[in-house]
């Protein structure tokens, strides 16, 4: 069974499994299926808005899809989330990416 199928099996049993949803989004991104990846990140972040790795990777995926304005918005939201949760490492990574995007 491939990773996408395995992750979908997990999500069938528990649709709010944060790690499986994140993994599925990352697998789609790795395969270049950015639309499906972003759809999975959207589901993930609706259920877990303060999941900063999801914010950061969604922003990177948006940037890869040349959706720079959306990536900046995601980073701004992710930075606020990182501040709320005290995740200084994620905050600094997202601030650096935001500065890089201009």
What are the residue ranges of the model-derived segments?
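Residue at a conserved register position within TPR or TPR-like alpha-solenoid repeats
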Residues: 28, 62, 95-98, 102
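Canonical positions in the second alpha-helix
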Residues: 9-10, 43-44, 78
């Amino acid at each position: 069974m491939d990773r996408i199928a395995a992750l979908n099996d997990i999500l069938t049993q528990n649709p709010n499994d944060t790690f499986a949803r994140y993994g599925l989004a990352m697998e789609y991104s790795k395969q270049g299926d950015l639309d499906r990846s972003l759809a999975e990140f959207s589901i993930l972040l609706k259920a877990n808005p303060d999941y900063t790795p999801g914010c950061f990777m969604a922003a990177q995926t948006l940037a890869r899809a040349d959706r720079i304005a959306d990536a900046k918005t995601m980073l701004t939201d992710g930075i606020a989330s990182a501040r709320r949760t005290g995740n200084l490492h994620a905050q600094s990574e997202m601030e650096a990416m935001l500065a890089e995007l201009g």
